[in-house]
Amino acid sequence: MIKLHSNDNMAEAFMNAFWTPDSQALAPYLAAWQQAHKGLQIIAGSLQPGMTEQDCELLIRDWLRAHQLFDPARPPKVRFTAQPTRRRFGLNRPGKRRYRIGMGYILRCDAVQNGYAAKACLSGPGVVQLAALHRRLRDYHDQLPHALVRGETPQQLADRFPGLRQHYRLAPLTGTLPEGNRIGEGPLIPGLWQWQLTLSDGTHSAGSSEFLLMDDQGPRWLTDTPAHLLDTNNNGNNRKQEEAA
């Protein structure tokens, strides 16, 4: 457990309601996260011309199930992007978009193991519409720990990123969050924080859901890179944004 270097009784009361993990307690979550990314990389390397989005979703589902990571309540999602405009005929009818060499793809899944749920997303090759959003999300991801060390609040940093929305809260790794867990705009107290980000340019959006650890070693993310969840506008038709669960 982390020792609080503060005489603030309110902060101590907050900490009594939450379990603060040691260095090994997060290993199961990180293992599930690594497995999720490994699975998406394998499926991306297996894409073949003629495969539909549904075919690819079934492949991801089967891979997760074979590794005991599948949760029926969290089905994988696949989207093929940047498909050239052409007359729909036969197998190219609406709802049956098929992969062709050079198309972009967005693969999403959740790996669930022993109560730990880790999100993963993989996009490629070169989905240019999302590159700027990815870069800005990565900038925020990299700058937040340094901003917290300087004494800035998360909202002060977010104000420098137009179009960014964020939600964060103290969170245990498993179990139901108690009432009163949301914290205002004051300094973050020690603990494990769940962070959700959404960044939009009006047409496309990207988001992430990840964990920030605050302890006597300073603020730091559990993973080096953001886990992006993506939403694109395909062929001029806006799709409903898929937010982090």
Language model features with spans:
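Active-site neighborhoods and metal-handling regions in enzymes and metal-associated proteins
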Residues: 1-245
